[in-house]
Design a protein with these regions (language model features):
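An acidic/histidine-cluster motif and surrounding catalytic segment
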Residues: 1-100, 104-235
Length: 235
């Protein structure tokens, strides 16, 4: 029997793209309540007044001349804005919410994933953790302590294609949106939690989700199916 206190909020760009179709088909197997937010691709120069810490020099333009160049673009702002909308949408009720990007795929069987969702919710109900990351950790992730059989206290996660937020902490998330300027979604979450002195729950040893292959709207280049965006661990 499916839980009635869990929902998925998925951030969408192009409902007809192959990677979004694959993602929906994967996530819909879970049988949870489902909300899709269509987040139009940003085509204007990104705002400078609310970039994180006033670092306007990090903004390189509407797009990157070189996809491998570092810098913030309209695509990054649009991605951040999409996550903010998803967070707000998740907080309209008391459901535990999985926020998923448009290309998120399950990497384990459905029942196993549901069991890990239950493990995350049990931690939420017995602790003050505000987020559980269902993405694969990268080589920069550091761990503090083991919290459950599979979840560790950690930080510095790269990529944001699947995470669960705790509805008890609505005010925390609103405060972070109001007080931490925009960045890439993953680094915005990293900064938001670090500056509040908070750790994240991380599935340390498990590869629960991955990203489907396709053209990245942020980098405007084709990306293969992958678990993490950082080189240095097995993809």
């Amino acid at each position: 029997m499916n839980r009635t206190d869990v929902k998925i909020v998925q951030i969408s760009l192009d409902l007809q793209s192959q990677r979004e179709i694959e993602s929906y088909n994967s996530l819909s197997q879970l049988g949870y309540k489902y909300i899709r937010i269509v987040n139009p691709i940003q085509k204007d120069y990104p705002p400078t007044h609310n970039v994180i810490d006033g670092n306007t020099h990090w903004i390189v333009g509407i797009t990157k001349p070189d996809p491998n160049e570092w810098g913030l673009t309209a695509g990054h702002y649009g991605a951040w804005h999409g996550h903010v909308n998803a967070i707000y949408s998740s907080l309209v009720d008391t459901d535990y919410t999985l926020i998923c990007e448009c290309d998120c795929l399950l990497n384990v069987d459905v029942q196993s994933f549901k069991d890990y969702v239950d493990e995350a919710i049990n931690l939420f109900e017995t602790s003050d953790y505000k987020i559980i990351r269902f993405e694969v950790p990268n080589f920069q992730t550091t761990y503090d302590k083991q919290l459950t059989e599979n979840i560790y206290s950690g930080d510095l996660m790269i990529m944001t294609h699947c995470y669960m937020i705790n509805p008890k902490y609505r005010d925390f998330y609103i405060n972070r949106v109001d007080n931490v300027g925009w960045h890439t979604p993953d680094w915005w979450l990293n900064f938001s939690f670090e500056r509040a002195g908070e750790k994240m729950g991380v599935f340390k040893e498990l590869k629960l989700t991955k990203q489907a292959a396709g053209v990245s709207s942020v980098d405007n280049t084709h990306r293969p199916e992958r678990f993490t965006g950082i080189e240095g661990i097995e993809n």
